[in-house]
Amino acid sequence: MKGLTSKIPRALQTGSKMVCADNTGARVVQIVSVFGYHGVKNRQPKMGLGDLATVTVKKGTPDMKRKLVRAVVVRQKKEFRRPNGLRVSFEENAMILLNENGDPRGTDIKGPVAREVAERFPKVGSMATIII
C-alpha cells in the first residue's frame, strides 16, 4: 500500500456512521476498528481519507446486515490541503467495502473519489467514475 501525497486530518473515529458508496447492498456502516492504529490507553482510534477500517453494516439488504467487513474511506467532510495549496472537502463521509485482498467487493462506486485514495488503491481508482 502506497503512502498518501497529502497530510489528511483524522476526522473520523470509532462509532462514526457513514454512507456506503458502492453497490454491495450495504447503505450505512459503522466504524468498529482502524487498521494499523497503535494508540494510547482509553484513546479513541481516529482515521481519515484512505485509511482501512473494520466496519459493521447497520442498514442494507438482509444478507449484508450485521456483518463485519473491511472498508476504506473515499470521501470526508473535513477539508484537507494538497501540496499544491488546493483545499478539498466533500459533502459527506463515505466508504466502500473491500475484500481481504484489498479489492472492492462491489462493481460500481457512487459519487466522486479522492485522488489520494485512487493512488493508494488502484482498483478503486479504475472503478471510480469521478476522481477529484
Curated annotation (Swiss-Prot):
Write down the superkingdom of origin: Archaea
Question: CDD domains, from UniProt?
Answer: Ribosomal_uL14
- Gene Ontology biological-process entries: translation
Gene Ontology cellular-component terms for this entry are:
cytosolic large ribosomal subunit
Q: Which Pfam families match?
A: Ribosomal_L14
User: Which InterPro entries does the protein's record reference?
Assistant: Ribosomal_uL14, Ribosomal_uL14_arc, Ribosomal_uL14_sf
The terms under GO molecular function for this entry are: large ribosomal subunit rRNA binding; structural constituent of ribosome
Alphabetized, the UniProt keywords read: Ribonucleoprotein, Ribosomal protein, RNA-binding, rRNA-binding
Q: PANTHER family from the xrefs?
A: 50S/60S RIBOSOMAL PROTEIN L14/L23, LARGE RIBOSOMAL SUBUNIT PROTEIN UL14
Give the family per the record. Belongs to the universal ribosomal protein uL14 family.
**What role does this protein play?**
Binds to 23S rRNA. Forms part of two intersubunit bridges in the 70S ribosome.
The protein's name: Large ribosomal subunit protein uL14
Q: Which organism is it from?
A: Methanocorpusculum labreanum (strain ATCC 43576 / DSM 4855 / Z)
Name the gene: rpl14
